[in-house]
Amino acid sequence: MFALELDCRSREYGWGIVSNAAHPGFTKTNLQITGPGHGTSGNSALERFYGFTFRFMPFAYQDVEHGILPALYAATSVQANGGDYYGPSGFGEIAGRAAEATIPKRARVATDNRRLWTVSEDLTGTTYPHQGNRK
């Protein structure tokens, strides 16, 4: 959501920034089973699923060298577009070559993206050029 809003603002105000996002799919790291809520109030069903599959079905995960490819594509390819989302191209975006991924419907709500930006500015005490600097 933040990447979408950054790209939108960059185009609107002429910042010259291309912003996109990427995800690694199912990759052999602990990213899916750790995080801000890990170990606090019990594991969610999704955390239990990831933990189970990571432990008992490691073949379902791609290695780190393949998992990083969507992020590398998004950051370095001249074909990567601002406002796009990249991930593995295979079934369910779990594994495969880097390709354009599906942006979740909830992440495409422009008013929510603007709100996230505003809250981020408020929480960090940072603002960026706005009106008057438009392209």
Describe each model-derived feature in a short phrase.
Residues 1-135:
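NAD(P)H-dependent oxidoreductase Rossmann-fold/reductase module
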